[in-house]
């Protein structure tokens, strides 16, 4: 990170004294996949619904609702979507070793929908490695984050871009700790198109046990110029064991990877519109760059 991420003993930051600084800095560590790390349970989230609970808001429109009934005999509407997701995941695992991209995310946390955040990302699948550089908004520009599975005692390294914040130096944080999760729905360990594909399969396998599910396919959709198949899933009736009211997944037709995901809560008032909970887009994806350990070395990035 332009030499800024090398960590010496005197640079390590005592997190016990970090609270006041963190309230100002609020280093936003991004993840783009729709499932997360957070301790405890959240009101409205059935503990049997698959996936980790997001930090912040889960669906509110199904609080106090009953469970969906079991699906009737026959082909479930989700089966074609599940087959497409499974096929894409198999192809991804066998053909994509790493990629770079621009990530655009927007999340609702504590009832407030945040602004769009833009990040440049490098991701390697084995061992799982992530480098993030924040492009926008201006308050986050220049911030950098590195995570490599099995390195740095399982922690991520974060550094501010410039100004007073950069004087703090490099911070080593638990990926799913309270400080790293502040302002984020998901941990950095859940970022990436492979993690997104896995979670989509998990949720689809869960939801196809039940009825009250409408699925539509929209071919030739476009995301930043890429031709995609859009899969839209709607649970029309609020039910405790569903994660969302409406979700759209855009599958890149060439790579068979999900490059955009958006999820909505049920309307919070009668006659209201679905409420956006989260959206993530992977743009300018360049696969198989041959990334090595050097690409995720804090002294080199």
Question: What residue ranges belong to the model's regions?
Answer:
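N-terminal secretory signal peptides that target proteins for export/translocation
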Residues: 1-22
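Residue-identity detector for glycine
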Residues: 3-6, 40, 44
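Bacterial N-terminal signal peptides
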Residues: 17, 24-38
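Residue-level detector of bioactive/disordered segments in secreted/extracellular proteins
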Residues: 21-24, 103
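Short secondary-structure junctions and interdomain/linker hinges
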Residues: 35, 95-99, 207
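Compositionally biased, proline/threonine/alanine/serine-rich low-complexity intrinsically disordered stretches
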Residues: 42-76
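N-terminal mature ectodomain segment of secretory-pathway/periplasmic proteins
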Residues: 76-164
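Gly/Pro-enriched, hydrophobic low-complexity segments
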Residues: 110, 135, 157-160, 166-167, ...
